[in-house]
A protein has these predicted regions:
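NAD(P)+-binding Rossmann beta1-loop-alpha1 motif at the extreme N-terminus of oxidoreductases
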Residues: 1-54
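Rossmann-like NAD(P)-binding element
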Residues: 57-71
Length: 71
């Protein structure tokens, strides 16, 4: 199976949080980048250290080998 070094997660709600935490446990070195249109949700994700959070969608997906939609 292909190994992904950068994964973007679009939508940072409950499902995305579970996915990010699982990916982080599986490989702590993986680059996880998230985006949500809701600023409150983005701030919460930042606060708990879920992933690197971007405020612009194009920044979140740039260079990603895998994009997971959780909307």
């Amino acid at each position: 199976m292909k190994e992904f070094r950068k994964i973007s997660v679009i939508g940072l709600g409950l499902i995305a949080s579970s996915i990010c935490l699982t990916l982080r446990q599986k490989d702590p070195t993986i680059k996880l980048v998230g985006y949500d249109k809701d600023k409150v949700v983005r701030n919460r994700a930042k606060k708990i250290g879920l992933c690197k959070v971007e405020s612009k969608l194009d920044n979140a997906v740039s260079g990603s080998q895998l994009i997971i939609l959780c909307v």
